[in-house]
């Protein structure tokens, strides 16, 4: 590649990565601050109280509601810290840890991740309820399956070797950590933008779409959203969702595909990192990977087939914005 062309290419990808990152940061920074305030004020514990009976239906001690509430409001790492602090007093089985880990994987980081999905054109309330409700239904199914078959009933073993902090880090340290995380997000998005351009140039995207055609047809996801969906499922909703925001604003991806893609990404994403993370506290792959993946595919396939049967007004009011209609925070 000639030097002037390379300079133009570099300028373009940095600009695109900057635009994607800026959209994400506008969403993430206020929510990060809000969640930190909730954490500092000790309010997350109150959010966990209504979850006590819900956790018991899934065969879990009521105390695990605090773990799931922490995951939903904050992130998996914070939830794991809470889990480790409670684990000695709870004496859970592998099946119970797998159920808890699976519901955490389906519904975590909701303020940021659902807001990202909304920014791309889906409806906030539906996405949030789908993930919370989906986590509960899947957790209940796993609980029944493990209980009726007598599977994974042995005492759980925790492999996590990290230290459990006695208290949250001071605010300056927390702020520095968030800035580092945001910088890392920009770097990863920059790499993804470069990879996407290379894959389009080499027609790798066309090859992937052809290979995944049966699955995409089953899910009702168009080829334009295929690669972005894969990125989100493998790497995380922040990255896949961030790229879809850019594509949806340019009109490249249809609203129906955005809805199907982001719903699938919401239910199952970060298939490698998050799955490995939860195995460190003893969760079994049968729940946190295979059941989660199968459940997510079936839910999205069912929703896509249900869409044509629903009134258009209900769909656009409840599920996703009309084609060309700005979402709640577009243009911000």
Q: Residue ranges of each PLM-predicted region?
A:
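Transmembrane helix-loop-helix hairpins in multi-pass inner-membrane proteins
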Residues: 107-165, 273, 278-310, 318
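Hydrophobic alpha-helical transmembrane segments
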Residues: 25, 39-51, 68-83, 98-99, 124-134, 173-176, ...
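Small-residue-enriched transmembrane helix starts and helix-helix packing motifs
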Residues: 13, 50-69, 174, 225
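Alpha-helical membrane segments and immediately flanking helix-loop junctions
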Residues: 61-120, 218-278
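Selected transmembrane alpha-helices and immediately adjacent juxtamembrane segments
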Residues: 1-54, 132-140, 144-216, 294, ...
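Membrane-water interface at transmembrane helix exits
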Residues: 31, 35-39, 83-87, 117, ...
């Amino acid at each position: 590649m000639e030097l002037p062309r390379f300079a133009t290419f570099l300028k373009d990808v940095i600009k695109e990565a900057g635009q994607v990152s800026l959209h994400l940061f506008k969403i993430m920074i206020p929510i990060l601050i809000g969640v930190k305030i909730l954490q500092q004020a000790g309010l997350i514990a109150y959010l966990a109280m209504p979850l006590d009976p819900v956790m018991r239906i899934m065969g879990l001690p009521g105390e695990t509601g605090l773990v799931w509430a922490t995951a939903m409001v904050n992130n998996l790492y914070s939830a794991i810290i809470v889990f480790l602090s409670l684990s000695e007093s709870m004496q859970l089985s592998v099946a119970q840890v797998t159920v808890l880990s699976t519901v955490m994987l389906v519904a975590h980081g909701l303020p940021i991740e659902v807001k990202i999905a909304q920014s791309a054109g889906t409806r906030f309330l539906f996405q949030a309820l789908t993930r919370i409700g989906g986590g509960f239904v899947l957790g209940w199914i796993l609980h029944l399956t493990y209980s009726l078959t007598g599977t994974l009933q042995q005492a759980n073993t925790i492999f996590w070797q990290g230290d459990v902090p006695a208290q949250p880090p001071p605010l300056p340290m927390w702020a520095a950590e968030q800035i580092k995380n945001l910088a890392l997000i920009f770097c990863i998005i920059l790499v993804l933008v470069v990879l996407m351009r290379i894959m389009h140039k080499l027609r790798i995207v066309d090859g992937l779409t052809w290979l995944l055609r049966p699955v995409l047809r089953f899910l009702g996801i168009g080829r334009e959203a295929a690669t972005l969906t894969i990125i989100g499922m493998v790497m995380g909703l922040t990255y896949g969702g961030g790229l879809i925001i850019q594509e949806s604003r340019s009109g490249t991806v249809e609203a129906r595909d955005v809805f199907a893609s982001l719903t699938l990404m919401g239910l199952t994403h970060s298939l490698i990192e998050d799955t490995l993370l939860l195995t460190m506290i003893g969760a079994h792959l049968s729940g946190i990977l295979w059941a989660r993946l199968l459940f997510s595919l079936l839910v999205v396939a069912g929703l896509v087939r249900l869409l044509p049967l629903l009134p258009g007004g209900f769909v656009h009011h409840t599920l996703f914005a009309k084609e060309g209609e700005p979402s709640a925070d577009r243009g911000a």
